[in-house]
């Protein structure tokens, strides 16, 4: 892993050069929306959490509109463990029975979201927390998980949903009033049930609906890796399909890369998978020329 960037050790002239390098990117993204899927170590290590909060505040201050969609898998696992319940995953998706759904809502919409909002506000930003149930933001339907061993059959994984529709009005209203939206990936269905939705899928759909200029997905690895552990810096749709087919992309990376590719195909101009373990990874990707992570292309 790259060493964290310690800005206190950078000479003033170099700091000026860094700011000058950022200027064309600030101009490019000024007034534009950037959707950030926030997760992994960046959500659990205090140094990285504080760095992320400062990053999104800086983006807002220079006229870029960050929208945060957060995960919370480790926190959900810890909460389930406390009640003696093990987490189960199928194809990267958490099996969510009624009891697990109650835990998911409490952890994501309460503990995790409020931690993010509080930290951003502590450092001088203005963040507002939402779940997909607020303002009719995320309409969900039950996810039918295809059974790979039995074509035409589906696996019931409980109250796991997929995005049926997004009403972005509440997000746009917050942006217009200079707030930073922080969204928990919980949707509501026509059946009256709450649904646990993979945060990567929500981030991709939201980026599309908001006509975002950029979608960033933070993870705990440098980006998409080949079978020899080498970083793949640029992937086309055809190359991604091949990596799905040979099993290079698997587990929790499946929904992440699928969502990233769908967003790219739907018109999001820039889609990147970035290493959230590196301090200030958001700023490095958006405001510098530094090649960073994996770029996902639709063609």
UniProtKB/Swiss-Prot annotation:
One of its GO terms (biological process) is L-arginine biosynthetic process. The keyword Amino-acid biosynthesis applies. Gene3D superfamilies: Acetylglutamate kinase-like. GO terms for molecular function: acetylglutamate kinase activity; ATP binding. Catalyzes the ATP-dependent phosphorylation of N-acetyl-L-glutamate. Transmembrane segments: none annotated. InterPro entries: AceGlu_kinase-like_sf (IPR036393), AcgluKinase_fam (IPR004662), ArgB (IPR037528), Asp/Glu/Uridylate_kinase (IPR001048), NAGK-C (IPR041727). This is Acetylglutamate kinase. Its EC number is 2.7.2.8. It holds the Pfam family AA_kinase. Pathway: Amino-acid biosynthesis; L-arginine biosynthesis; N(2)-acetyl-L-ornithine from L-glutamate: step 2/4. The keyword Amino-acid biosynthesis applies. It catalyses: N-acetyl-L-glutamate + ATP = N-acetyl-L-glutamyl 5-phosphate + ADP. The record marks 37, 256 as: Transition state stabilizer. Keywords: Amino-acid biosynthesis, Arginine biosynthesis, ATP-binding, Cytoplasm, Kinase, Nucleotide-binding, Transferase. It is found in: Cytoplasm. Substrate binds at residues 72-73, 94, 196. GO terms for cellular component: cytoplasm. Belongs to the acetylglutamate kinase family. ArgB subfamily.
